[in-house]
Regions:
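RNA-binding accessory domains that recognize and position tRNA/RNA substrates
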Residues: 1-59, 63-69, 79-81, 97-253
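Short alpha-beta junction capping motif
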Residues: 77-91
Length: 253
């Protein structure tokens, strides 16, 4: 129930959803940093023409593999823009593939669980995250980068993945194989904060309380004096919708 007119004029981070089970966690972590963030599916992202208010793009993880002939791709024009980009898991592999690097299946069928991250280069993405050069991160992947793309450098490794984190030499394009959005990754939220605040340079512009008030006013404007029927399952989503509509139109619900 969001007004597109309002969201389009707000500076934001956009998360492109490639099907990861934890994609929405990325947006949640960024909103916890008081920065406005939207999750957009691939088809809707392809339709975006105006990027003026998009200050950063995050490519989520997902179940697909770039090693097949057909796989979900990201529109190529975003790499020609000056908008910072962070690829997470599958997002890293998309970036690597696009710029000419090589992706292969890992020796293990799938790497899932805790891994020790070893920093290889001082990167703003990891700034002030770790007192030591080693830290715990959470992996969930079956493909890995085996050859860096041209003009990229390696900024972190694990025992099972040489190129766990990479960045472009001149552009603000980053990729990480692990998941900073989950609590299992040490300083994961700080990594996301470095991306949105230090790299994207977006200022805090979102509060949950203000968002609630905005949605209620938006509902009032759209519904006016009409009657509304709300189907309530008892789950979180429908319950929140029911409360918001009730706050907006009272007896007309």
């Amino acid at each position: 129930m969001r007004s597109k007119n309002i969201s389009e004029v707000k500076k934001k981070i956009v998360v492109v959803d490639f099907g990861s089970q934890v994609t929405k966690l990325i947006a949640r972590r960024i909103r916890e940093l008081k920065i406005y963030c939207e999750v957009v599916n691939l088809k809707d992202f392809d339709k975006i023409n105006d990027f003026s208010q998009i200050k950063g793009i995050i490519l989520s993880g997902g179940p697909s593999t770039v090693t097949k002939k057909s796989y979900p791709k990201i529109r190529s024009d975003i790499f020609k823009k000056s908008i910072p980009i962070l690829g997470i898991c599958y997002g890293l592999q998309l970036i690597t593939k696009f710029f000419g690097g090589k992706i292969k299946k890992t020796k293990k069928k799938r790497e899932f669980g805790e891994a020790t991250l070893i920093e290889k280069s001082n990167s703003v993405l990891f700034k002030n995250c770790y007192n030591q050069k080693r830290s715990k991160v959470w992996m969930s992947h079956q493909d890995a980068v085996f050859k860096l793309p041209k003009n990229f450098i390696n900024i972190a490794s694990t025992n099972n993945s040489k190129f766990t984190a990479i960045q472009h030499k001149t552009k603000k394009i980053y990729g990480i194989q692990f998941h900073p959005e989950v609590t299992h990754t040490e300083k994961g939220k700080e990594i996301l904060n470095n991306f949105v605040s230090k790299i994207c340079k977006i200022k805090k512009n979102w509060l949950l309380s203000l968002e609630k008030n905005r949605i209620i006013e938006d509902l009032k404007d759209k519904i006016k004096n009409k009657k509304v029927i709300c189907a309530l399952s008892g789950g979180v989503d429908s319950s929140v919708v029911a409360v918001l509509i009730n706050n907006a139109i009272k007896k007309n619900l």
